[in-house]
Curated annotation (Swiss-Prot):
PROSITE patterns (UniProt xref): TAT
Signal peptide: 1-30
Identification of the protein by name: Alpha-N-acetylgalactosaminidase
Residues at which substrate binds: Y212, R248, Y260, P261, T262, H263, Y342
GO MF: alpha-N-acetylgalactosaminidase activity; nucleotide binding
Function: Glycosidase that has specific alpha-N-acetylgalactosaminidase activity.
Superkingdom of this protein's organism: Bacteria
Post-translational modification: Predicted to be exported by the Tat system. The position of the signal peptide cleavage has not been experimentally proven.
Class in the EC hierarchy, top level: hydrolase
UniProt xrefs under PANTHER family: BCDNA.GH03377, GLYCOSYL HYDROLASE FAMILY 109 PROTEIN
Co-factor binding comment: Binds 1 NAD(+) per subunit. The NAD(+) cannot dissociate.
Cofactor: NAD(+)
Organism (species): Tannerella forsythia
Length: 468
């Protein structure tokens, strides 16, 4: 059935929501593990004579606007076209672009396949996709097949194992470079910790923990007022809601797994050289009961609220353990339905020491006092990554503490110099596959499931490439 946003959103208001689900099958593990078939691709040159890189954007919500800030904040870029089916975000984005005193881009809107017209009509050096999750793969695949040399896709890049293979196969077949826009990999403390890992301070890597631990209850029932904790807001999800609540909440209704793993696993994967001398071998996942979203609805709207009748399938806390080829283990947690402060819960541990994000702790054997934590800030000042020390002033003006700017700068550097992307199709697939695999494992009572080798054996010889 055609994957349309309209059909997806209609599920939200249907009686007895929750029966749909996004199935994960064994066929996903094997049937798609074949080299991508030749794809028809328009050959479009990278860069015009004026030296400006040509960008297109699909999806014009708040993430798009932050990306536009950084694209236009870096010299040598222009926006050719933008696309969205909703007028409101388009108008906001056009006003946002106008602040930069640059030509207005061409606008594509109307039908849900309008992005295909944009891709076929315009020439781009890069297209950035910041749409609802279920559209990431169809749009990225369409962009690569249309001959766009570089495609940036927001997180998570894919929802199922099949979709992960689609990204890999089409990227390989077309030669287009896919980059997953995982901004946390560029967080300042994360990059400093990565440098410490690479310089051997923690010894041989043994274990990592991470997760997306973020109270999203207001995000999932957002009417545009309630999200900001103002009085008078209403619980909203589905077509009448605001921003992500239009589509994101439905994933909590129909799915049960780690549906948003990349903020945590991306940085840990870089520390473990995943896809570059190491790889994920297997995964097992378990989910708790689901209580948080129902309780939130009852607390805010009463026991008779229509949403109180919805069965939210997503366990409040989903815990996954991954085994790596080189022996390491990783624990990944998804926790978005309960009251809590934000944390990605990083722990990077080796034979000589570790970093723990919560508490800002570092311990290095032989340099730290025995059995006493050091403040991580003291270490991170010494091991600040060169991207941050070079771009700090510009980055501080950007979103998410500057990591969005650093990420876009690194991506644009690859585009302009026609290099492989910092976080490629194999990273996008391996990190995002946790979603589909965790759903499979939970459905089987926590059974161990094998991780596909999206590199088809290349991981043995591939060298680390991120933020060298």
């Amino acid at each position: 059935m055609e994957n349309t946003r309209r059909n997806f959103l209609k599920k939200v208001t249907a009686a007895g929501i929750g029966a749909a689900g996004l199935a994960v099958t064994d066929q996903a593990m094997a049937a798609v593990n074949q080299p991508g078939e030749a794809a028809q691709q328009k050959k479009k040159p990278a860069g015009k004579s004026d030296g400006m890189l040509r960008f297109g954007f699909i999806g014009t919500g708040s993430r798009c606007q932050e990306h536009i800030n950084n694209v236009l904040g870096i010299q040598g870029n222009k926006i050719v076209a933008i696309c969205d089916i909703q007028k409101g975000p388009l108008e906001k984005t056009l006003k946002h672009i106008a602040k930069f005193n640059v030509p207005e881009p061409k606008v594509y809107t109307g039908g849900e396949r309008e992005f295909e017209k944009m891709l076929n009509n315009e020439e781009f050096d890069c297209v950035i996709i910041a749409s609802p999750w279920e559209w990431h793969v169809p749009m990225a695949v369409a962009a690569m097949k249309a001959g766009v040399p570089y495609v940036g896709v927001e997180v998570s890049a894919a929802n199922t194992v099949e979709e992960c293979w689609d990204l890999v196969n089409v990227s390989e077949a077309t030669g287009s470079h896919l980059n997953i826009l995982e901004n946390v990999c560029y967080r300042r403390d994360v990059m400093a910790a990565l440098r410490m890992v690479r310089e051997g301070l923690f010894g041989e890597m043994i274990h990592g923990t991470c997760g997306y631990q973020h109270d999203l209850r207001d995000v999932k029932f957002n009417d545009g007022i309630h999200y900001t904790y103002q009085e008078g807001g209403e619980l909203r999800m589905g077509p009448t809601a605001y921003a992500e609540a239009q589509w994101r909440t439905q994933h909590s209704v129909t799915r049960n797994g780690d549906i948003y793993p990349t903020h945590g696993i991306g940085p840990v994967a870089n520390c473990l050289n995943i896809n570059r001398g190491n790889r994920f071998l297997s995964l097992t996942s378990m989910a708790t009961q689901s209580r948080g979203l129902h309780n939130f609805v009852v607390d805010k709207g009463g026991a008779n609220h229509p949403y109180a009748k919805i069965h939210f399938n997503l366990g409040d806390i989903v815990t996954s353990m991954i085994k790596c080829a080189n022996g390491q283990t990783v624990i990944v947690t998804h926790d978005t339905n309960l009251p809590r402060p934000y944390s990605l819960g990083f722990r990077i541990q080796g034979t000589r020491g570790l970093w723990m994000n919560d508490g800002n702790h570092v311990y290095v054997e032989g340099q730290s006092k025995p059995h006493r934590w050091d403040a991580s800030d003291d270490w991170f000042k010494k091991y600040d990554h060169k991207l941050w020390s070079t771009l700090e002033l510009k980055a501080k003006e950007a979103g998410h503490g500057g990591m969005d700017y650093i990420m876009m700068y690194d991506f644009i550097d690859a585009i302009r110099n026609k290099k492989p992307t910092p976080m490629d199709c194999y990273d996008a697939a391996a990190w995002s596959a946790i979603s589909g695999l965790s759903e499979m494992s939970i459905a089987r009572g926590g059974a161990v499931v094998d991780f596909p080798d999206f590199t088809r054996g290349q991981w043995i010889h591939r060298q680390p490439a991120f933020a060298l």
